[in-house]
Amino acid sequence: MSITATDLYEDGPAAGAKAKILLIHFDGAIDAGAAGRIAIGQMLRSLHNERVATFDADTLMDYRSHRPIVTVDDWVSSPDMVMPKTVLDLVEDDMGNPILVLHGAEPDAHWESFTNAINDICKRAGVEITFSLHGVPSGVPHTRPTPVHVQATDASLLPAGGAKITNHMQFPAPLSTFVQIRLGQRGIGGLALLGAVPYYMADTGYPAASSALLTSLAKFADLSLPCLLYTSPSPRDS
């Protein structure tokens, strides 16, 4: 059975939203220190947001990799399972600037069809550029400021003199990168912001990288964002 873009999502209250920026982050993708996830959570907690679209998990997810969460009380299973969810929200920064935020569980299947759906929404909304947020393991110590590296779909989007880990890399692409590349081929450029996370903090929450990502996003996109997060000391400080 063929899948059309509109089969993959259900419109929300803000379905007709207009925004020049699409921000992408999926749980389960490349994100050392949960840097991107914490940053997105900070935005959603601190800023006004409305639902634009909810994507069909039954079509996009492999439930063996995104298992529903069930609660059992006194040996009785609750019917209210927490299902994996991928959504698109309209978020307004502190100055009222609109941002489309695509977040939630990373879909397992139908990436091309999913991207077609995102492209259609972007065209209607007037999106001009995309950003994605990631934490990447690095040799940087936690006592240093967190550098943010920038990956782009076009060389013209790269900042002059920006920090670079290396000039050549190959890695299995997360869906955020896949979407940005496909949208780039259709005229919507993309930047991936990569916050450096100490290797020894990669498997735990590292808010310092999240703050650095939000600060970089605010700078590149000219947004007013809640960039300051509480950063607990590393266990190695004690």
Language model regions located:
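Internal, conserved structured core segments that host functional sites
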Residues: 97, 105-156, 179
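Short, solvent-exposed amphipathic alpha-helical segments in soluble enzyme
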Residues: 38-43, 117-120, 208-211
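Acidic, glycine-rich active-site loops and adjacent beta-strand->loop/helix elements
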Residues: 27-29, 61, 105-108, 135-138, ...
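N-terminal short beta-loop-beta anion/metal-coordinating cradle
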Residues: 2-104
